Every structure is written in structure tokens, then in C-alpha cells.
Amino acid sequence: MSKIQVAHSSRLANLIDYKLRVLTQDGRVYIGQLMAFDKHMNLVLNECIEERVPKTQLDKLRPRKDSKDGTTLNIKVEKRVLGLTILRGEQILSTVVEDKPLLSKKERLVRDKKEKKQAQKQTKLRKEKEKKPGKIAKPNTANAKHTSSNSREIAQPSSSRYNGGNDNIGANRSRFNNEAPPQTRKFQPPPGFKRK
């Protein structure tokens, strides 16, 4: 563990972006960058790694009568990468500062301001897009000759289901024409529908 100088009276609010080692009631240790906390001491750790001693290794930790105090223990600790993690405050025993943040407070403030400006810019652009109606571009005269016949073919469904079995395109054009009145259909109740 590296020794980091932190004020004795520092609180969790002062330790945001610091790398912390969190001990829990079940004996597990979580190491990660503190991102947020709340009044219940629920912690959000970024790039979190979980370390725990497996049950098979617990016997080596228990003191034995025949062993001497100077013996070294070969205990294998299991590590697991968790990523972004929320720890329940009810389970937390203590927190220890592992490492200082990568950026100083001033650099973090500058970074946060930049991120805030970018977010505001994106929301402003999104709102402007929603306000403006979609632009309809007029095709070039050179391209219009090639695309006009293709667009008509695409707009008209060729299935016999739509044109009633005959290949008369003119009969089906009113369906895609905005000037034609909308067709009204008789109400067909679904199966099991009862009128009151």
C-alpha cells in the first residue's frame, strides 16, 4: 500500500476521485475510485476490483498451538474485476485511502466544465433539430431523369395483394396520392368482441 497524505478530519466528500480500499462485513475487500456516495454510505466505485480469501485458505489464517509466531503464511487471494460497482453502506466496515486521484482539483474542475459545456451544446442542437421541420432537397435535373422512374417503381407495391391481381398501376396510384380522399373501412370487431 502506498502512503498518501490525507487530512485526518477529511470526509468522503473530500475523497471523491481518490482510490479507496473498502472493507465489508463478509471479509471482502473492494478497491476502486470513489465516484459518489449518499447519506447511507452507499458507495459508487469505478474500476472496482474485489479481493477475497477463499474458504479453503481460511484455515491457514487461524492461529495454531504448534506454530510459531514468525512463520510466513502462503495465502492465495482471489481477485475479480467488477468495473462500476455500487456497494451497500450497511455492509461497509471501513474505508482506507489507497491512492490519490489522477487529476488535481483544478484539472477536475476544468474537465467537469468542459463536459458540462459539451452536454449543453448537444442538448441545444437536439432541441434545434426538433424545432426545425425536415428539409426536402430538390433533386438535380441530371439525376432527376434517372431517379424519377425508379422512385415511382419503389413507391408502388408490385404485390397482387395491393392491386387486386391486375397490373393496372393507374388504379393503385390514388392510394399513394396525397390529394385523393382517405378510404374509409367498415369496423371489423376482433374475435370475442361484444357490443354493449
From Swiss-Prot:
Start-end of Polar residues biased regions: 140-181
Domain called Sm: residue spans: 7-101
Keyword Ribonucleoprotein recorded: yes
Per the annotation, the residue ranges of the short sequence motif Nuclear localization signal are 105-132
Q: Name one Pfam family in it.
A: LSM
State if Nucleotide-binding is listed as a keyword: no
Compositional bias, Basic and acidic residues, is annotated for 108-118
GO biological-process terms attached to the record? 7-methylguanosine cap hypermethylation; mRNA 5'-splice site recognition; mRNA splicing, via spliceosome; spliceosomal complex assembly; spliceosomal snRNP assembly; U2-type prespliceosome assembly
Q: What else is known?
A: Present with 861 molecules/cell in log phase SD medium.
Instruction: Describe its function.
Output: Plays a role in pre-mRNA splicing as a core component of the spliceosomal U1, U2, U4 and U5 small nuclear ribonucleoproteins (snRNPs), the building blocks of the spliceosome.
Know the name of this protein? Small nuclear ribonucleoprotein-associated protein B
Organism name = Saccharomyces cerevisiae (strain ATCC 204508 / S288c) (Baker's yeast)
Question: What taxonomic lineage is listed for the species of origin?
Answer: Eukaryota, Fungi, Dikarya, Ascomycota, Saccharomycotina
